[in-house]
């Protein structure tokens, strides 16, 4: 079984490739999290978890959902994490999650994909994004081959920077930076409701045909990157920046 969480489509693409190659079941954690569905999942064998990197670990909402969900029959578990540059020491925490869930940890693969965290960084142009994805495809192929063969992923690097990023930075990143209040919608908003539909935490509601953000945000960037009229901004940090979602490529 392949479970994935995605903000702007990178993880969905990787998960679809893996599920297709392995002829395996593909399930969206976005849908389960949005609907509050924590019914047991009948995995019955290998489990592949695909997700973006949030502050050098897996997203907290994904970890929380997995801890609350019974994964029946799951054993060998592979993590595939996409990122804009690196995943830090996420593997340490993925291994710990497996211990907590009674799963056999089979490693963490890093896949560099186009940056989408425009609340802090710049997204690439479409042409740049296509080149990044083309470079990522062989790494996805390697991950597929390892999973198919039942092999562990090669251990990731363990530099001091990685340990600090995942251990010291991650806990303070959420309370300091993961906030929804800078989001606004301009007059070019057409009230289509796409942002409300995509938000995995139901943190966006339409009021008078305009999106209003609550306080429960994971900064997946789906709302700002999928807005069809580019009406959404994240304060001044997103002004003038390209938007990115995988389906545009």
Q: Residue locations for each model-derived region?
A:
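A mid-sequence, solvent-exposed acidic-amphipathic segment
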Residues: 159-191, 197
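Iron-sulfur cluster-binding cysteine motifs and their immediate structural context
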Residues: 184-185, 190-218, 222-239
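FMN-binding flavodoxin-like domain, especially the glycine-rich phosphate-binding loop
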Residues: 2, 6-14, 20-32, 41-51, ...
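Generic structural motif recognizing short loop/turn segments at the entrances and edges of beta-strands
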Residues: 22-23, 179-181, 209
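Generic structural signal for beta-strand residues in well-ordered domains
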Residues: 40-41, 70, 176, 192, ...
